[in-house]
Amino acid sequence: MTEKILILDFGSQYTQLIARRVRELNVYCEIHPYNKAPQIDGTVKGVILSGSPCSVREENAPDIDLSLYREKLPLLGVCYGAQLIAHKSGGTVQPSSIREYGRARLNNVHTSDDLFKEIVPDSQVWMSHGDTIVEIPSNFEILSSTETVRVAAYKVKGEDTFGIQFHPEVTHSLQGKELLRNFVVHICGCSQDWTPDAFVETTISELKAKIGTDKVVLGLSGGVDSSVAAVLIHKAIGPNLTCIFVDNGLLRKNEYEEVLNSYKHMGLNVIGVDAKKQFYKSLEGLSDPEAKRKAIGKEFIEVFDQESHKIADVKWLGQGTIYPDIIESVSVKGPSATIKSHHNVGGLPEKMKLKIVEPLNTLFKDEVRRVGKTLGIDDIILKRHPFPGPGLAIRILGDITAEKVAVLQEVDYIFISRLKEKGLYDQVWQAGAILLPVKSVGVMGDERTYENVVALRAVSSMDGMTADWIHLPYDFLADISNEIINRVKGVNRVVYDISSKPPATIEWE
C-alpha cells in the first residue's frame, strides 16, 4: 500500500497548500478534519497538524488526543498545531502584543537539527497568528526565533515532535519546501515514489479489479478532469466505457466539433448529443443565475439519462471528481454555504441507480494535468482554461437566446484566439467574455448606435479558490477592443474586469 503523510485540518485557509507542497515532494498525503481522523495504520509515516483561525485559549478550541501520535510517529505542528502541542504539554500560549502577519526573518537557527538541515540563518518565513507561545515545557528545545517571536520553532527532546509558528507551505517562506522535505523525507522516512507514472499504474490495476467486465458511462465536458478520468477508465476496461458529450448550445464557438474529434482521435467511444433546442427551451424566460444553473442541471440529467438507457447493462457512472471537491464536502467547517449550485451531475447517481467510480478523487488540478501528460493526452485538452459547466449561460447576464449566444461566441472566440496568438493564453488561469444586460450609445460611420456592452475577464490562480486579474498589455486590450467592435455586429463597447477573487468571483454569475 502507498505510504502517506496524514494532515489533520483545524480549519486553516492554508491546509490544502500543505498537502500540495508535500505532494510536490512525490509523497502522498491526505487531509482529514481533526475531529474525523482515521485510524493509524502501517501506511502512515508522519502527521502534520494544520493552522486554524481559532485560539487554543478558547473554551471550545479544536482539540485532539496527542497520545495517538506522539512517540509513535513523527509529528509536526504548524502555527495553531504548534501552539496546541505546547499548550497541552504544559506550555503557555498568550495573545501576541502585536499581531504578526507577513514576512519575518529567522534567527538563532539550530541547523544541526534534522528539521532545519540546510535552512540558512536569516531565512524569510511567513507569519499569520494572533497568539504566541511565551513559555515552553522543560523538555522542549527552541530551534529558531524571529525578532518578535522567541519560540518560532521547537522540538520535544527525545521525540520526533516539532512545532513551527510560521507557515512553510506559503511561497513567501522561501525555504518552506526544504523544511517540509526535511520533515517528510529525512525525519518521516518517506521514499518519494508517488509519481504520475506510479499513480497511473496503480489506478488502472485498481479500476480493473473494481469494475471487472461491467460497463461504465461517463459524461464528458471537454475539460481536463472528465477527459483524464475517461482515458484512465478506458485504459482499464477498454470498449466497456461509453462517453457522452452533450452539446447544450452554450459551448464556445466550434467547441463541440473540435472536442468530439479530439476524443475520437484518443480512441474513446464517444456519443455526441445535439440537445441545443431542449436546453434553450428549458431556459426560456429565466434570468436569475441560480434558476438558470438549476434548469441546465435538470436538463443535463434528463438528456444524459435518456442516452445512457440506450446502452445495455450499464452498472457504473464515471465522474471527474477531484480532491478539492472531496475535501470541501467533509471540511472542518462542514459543507460550505451554496454560493453557486453545481451544474450537472448532482442528481445523476440517485436517478440512474448506478455505482460511482471517481479515479481522480485523490488528485489536485495540477496533478490531474500531470497524470494526463503521462497518459499522452494532448495539450489542447490539458492546457484548456476551466470553463463553467453551465457554459455561456452564466456569461450572458439576463435571459438566454440563441442570438445572444451567437454574439458572445464570436466575442469569446476573438479574445481567446488572440491570447493564444500573442503567447498569453498559458499565462492565464481562465479567460472569457461576458455579455452585459445593458446597452450603450456609440457612433459608427457618422451614425448613432445603441448596442451591446461586453466585458473581458482574465485571471491568474493556482486552484480557483482565489484569483487575481491579469494585467494584460494595454496595446493588446486596445487591439482586441477594436477588433471586437468592428467584427461583431451588435457590440459597440468593450470593458475589462479588474476585480480579484475575493471579493468578486471569477464568473459573473
From Swiss-Prot:
The Glutamine amidotransferase type-1 domain sits at 4-193
Q: What InterPro entries does its record include?
A: Class_I_gatase-like, GATASE, GMP_synth_C, GMP_synth_GATase, GMP_synthase, GMPS_ATP_PPase_dom, NAD/GMP_synthase, Rossmann-like_a/b/a_fold
Q: In which pathway does it act?
A: Purine metabolism; GMP biosynthesis; GMP from XMP (L-Gln route): step 1/1
Q: Report the active site residues.
A: 79, 167, 169
Q: What is its EC number?
A: 6.3.5.2
Subunit relationships = Homodimer.
Matching HAMAP family? GMP_synthase
Q: What job does this protein perform?
A: Catalyzes the synthesis of GMP from XMP.
The family database entries (PANTHER family) matched by this protein are listed as: GMP SYNTHASE [GLUTAMINE-HYDROLYZING] (PTHR11922:SF2), GMP SYNTHASE-RELATED (PTHR11922)
User: What name goes with this protein?
Assistant: GMP synthase [glutamine-hydrolyzing]
Origin species: Cytophaga hutchinsonii (strain ATCC 33406 / DSM 1761 / CIP 103989 / NBRC 15051 / NCIMB 9469 / D465)
